[in-house]
Regions:
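Short, mixed-charge low-complexity intrinsically disordered segments
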Residues: 35-37, 41-68
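Short aromatic-glycine-(Arg/Gly/Cys) micro-motifs in beta-strand/loop hairpins
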Residues: 5-32, 68
Length: 68
């Protein structure tokens, strides 16, 4: 399982992006929330949506969950 985080700061389109901890776009400590360990990004995005309804996977580290 991998560790996933969500960026507390939304993107220009309103999305809060979900990242793996080794992503090159990994948010700074003050700007991220730990989501937990998951087998896939879909479960991590689902968890993120409990806090941020407009959540999306990072295009770089979670491309299969990137929708916008």
């Amino acid at each position: 399982m991998k560790s996933y985080y969500v960026n507390k700061n939304k993107q220009a389109n309103g999305d809060h992006e979900v990242h793996l901890n080794d992503c090159r776009y990994f948010p700074d400590a003050d700007n991220r929330k730990y989501l937990g360990q998951f087998d896939n990004c879909a479960d991590a995005v689902k968890e993120s949506k409990k806090t941020y309804s407009q959540s999306n996977g990072c295009k770089t580290c979670c491309p299969s969950c990137h929708t916008s």
